Amino acid sequence: MPESDTRTIHHVDAHVGQRVRQRRTALILDQETLARRIGVSFQQIQKYERGRNRISASRLYDIAKALAVPIDYFFSDLERGDPRHDGLWPRTWGAWPKAGAPRPIRCA
């Protein structure tokens, strides 16, 4: 049995794929047209939209450009604080030091 048939589809992959499909259909584009714009087959677009294949960061960038949306469009409807999101919205961010902030020096 092929690996793609046995793996569980991650809910974030399914969500991103659904958002790709929503935007593509809102622009009245077929899968073949989007595929040509980003240099893949229409079958690959089908797999992305169904969440069967994960979309790499560079490919998601290409899709966002082709669909004229910012990258965060694909993640905008994920609920914050949902533990299934593997720490995408950690509650502890406020407790972390800001990048570049001076840290106290401890003397022994």
UniProtKB/Swiss-Prot annotation:
SUPFAM superfamilies, alphabetized: lambda repressor-like DNA-binding domains (SSF47413)
**Annotated DNA-binding residue span(s):** 31-50
Q: InterPro entries, per this entry?
A: Cro/C1-type_HTH (IPR001387), Lambda_DNA-bd_dom_sf (IPR010982)
Pfam families linked to this entry:
HTH_3 (PF01381)
Domain of life, per lineage? Bacteria
Domain HTH cro/C1-type, by residue range, is: 20-74
Which GO molecular function annotations are given, in alphabetical order?
DNA binding
Q: Which UniProt keywords apply?
A: DNA-binding, Transcription, Transcription regulation
Supply the SMART domains for this chain: HTH_XRE
Identification of the protein by name: Uncharacterized transcriptional regulator in ATPase CF(0) region
Species for this entry: Rhodospirillum rubrum
